[in-house]
Amino acid sequence: MRGLPIGRWACLKKASSEGMHSAAAEEGRVEDLARLALQRWGVVFREILSRESLLPTWRELHQALRRLEARGEIRGGRFVSGFLGEQFATTEAIAGIRAVRNSPESDETILIAAADPLNLSGIITPGSRVSAQSTTVIAYKAGVPLFSGDLGEVRSRLQKA
């Protein structure tokens, strides 16, 4: 028996069967999807949104994100190093980034499920890609992936280290 899906999920509205939206309704739909991406990721930019197959084009999302920024709902800037282009973030994400930046580096090892949307190993972070299998976890230390495997295997390797 397969386990339940892991991670954060949200239902998307289907497009109208008529296929015709007013410009304002379409802008509102794209803004809703931009907010959904911001809720999921905290910080969004072109490379990270390329993972999302059901989102509109980057051009449409970028325009929506600029509107949200102009209304003061989100902030634009450079939040994640190593990526070109504009980035947008929620105020909560910015506060979290500042808190991490201002705190001393931790020796704590963190485990996340490979099926979690946070699994960006080999996608936008260095190293090999870890497939999103429900039985696989990834060990991180100081934001760097150390190794991955079944939970028991990873815990065993951590105890030996």
Language-model segments: residues:
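Long, charged, low-complexity, helical-prone intrinsically disordered regions
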Residues: 1-161
